[in-house]
Regions:
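Surface-exposed ligand/attachment interfaces on beta-rich extracellular proteins
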Residues: 3-4, 12-40, 101
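A structural detector for beta-sheet-dominated domains
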Residues: 10, 19-21, 47-49, 79, ...
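Intrinsic-disorder/low-complexity, polar/charged segments enriched in Ser/Thr/Lys/Arg/Asp/Glu/Gln
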Residues: 13, 41-43, 81-85
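Short, contiguous, helix-prone interaction/anchoring segments in small proteins
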Residues: 29-58
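Noncatalytic modules at the cell exterior or secretory-pathway interfaces
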Residues: 42-44, 86-103
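Beta-sandwich interaction modules
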Residues: 75-91
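Low-complexity intrinsically disordered segments
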Residues: 110-113
Length: 113
């Protein structure tokens, strides 16, 4: 395992937030790395700050992310209180559909675990 895969997570851009809802996921957002940071890091710290499961949709376009959030097979379930670091394309779009009600999701681009 490369030593760079063991570094602590370092934020490299602004945190975005959205309210995952049901029955329809909101417009997808990007969490870009600061343009002054010379990296193509594609790691994202994702927090589900709610008491319900969120089905995270990720895609290369807003429409793809919304479609992916709409089905269990193409989404990533985030359990209540989840704090994950996941790797995606640096220009990915994110949205989510909640199991019920609304849920706040925070996404921070960066690098590390």
């Amino acid at each position: 395992m490369a030593s760079s895969s063991q570094i602590p997570f370092a934020p490299l851009g602004d945190t975005i937030t959205f309210a995952a809802a049901t029955p329809t996921a909101p417009t997808a957002l990007q969490a870009p790395v600061h343009p002054t940071t010379n990296t193509s890091a594609g790691q994202f710290r994702i927090i589900n700050d709610s008491t319900v499961t969120v089905f995270l949709g990720v895609g290369s376009t807003s429409a793809d992310a919304i479609a992916n959030a709409g089905a269990v097979a193409t989404s990533i379930p985030l359990l209540p209180g989840t704090d994950e670091v996941l790797r995606f394309s640096p220009d990915a779009f994110f949205t989510g559909k909640s199991a019920s009600g609304t849920a706040t999701v925070y996404i921070t681009p960066g690098q590390g675990l």
